[in-house]
Amino acid sequence: MQTLTKLTLAALIWTAPASAETVKGLRTPGEFDSIADQTARSTALFEEMFVVIESPRCLNCHPVGDVPMQGDAMQPHQPPVVRGVGDFGATGMRCSTCHGAENVTFTTGEGSIPGHEPWQLAPIEMGWIGLTAAEVCAQLKDPARNGNRTLADLHEHNATDGLVGWGWEPGEGRTPAPGTQEIFGDLTQAWIDTGAACPAT
């Protein structure tokens, strides 16, 4: 009996780190420590960041054109809207016409109108839909296409920005982004600390 108990305990200890370091479908930076080559580890960290970036919660507001997407199926926004000046919608049909400071659940309880202050599209230079991980990575490191951000600024944006954080609290009827904003921020910092390497393709 003692042997069985020890074996069971050993099995629990052996398996605990793997389950503890994956949170809601997103791996934490510690899971990449076994990759000895720093560039390879950095690339792997970015590829894990891309798990969040390519989710509908992020892509819907990072279109490469003037029309945002919506829903988990990433359909064109209804009612029809356009980017407009400053990425806040067209005159007379601003994003804030429907989107308030917080999510509003439908009276039926099925679905909601998303909200955050401010509610806006990412600039067109930051469009991601259809881009590969390598292309998004290069874009994020390019001040001409990332809002003139340094890597430190990018970490702060990913880790603390409220509109980014909305992706994990998207309201009724939407699947949250994988993981948590804290882990996304930690992955971003670990990627930077290992050289901010990009995937080759």
Spell out what each predicted region is:
Residues 2-44, 56-59, 64-69, 189-201:
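Post-cleavage N-terminal segment of exported redox proteins
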Residues 31-52, 68, 72-88:
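Electrostatic cytochrome c docking/interface patches
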Residues 40, 56, 103, 109-201:
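C-type cytochrome heme-c attachment and multiheme electron-transfer modules
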Residues 44, 56, 90-93, 183:
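Short, well-structured alpha-helical interface segments that form or flank functional binding sites
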Residues 56-65, 92-103:
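The canonical Cys-X-X-Cys-His
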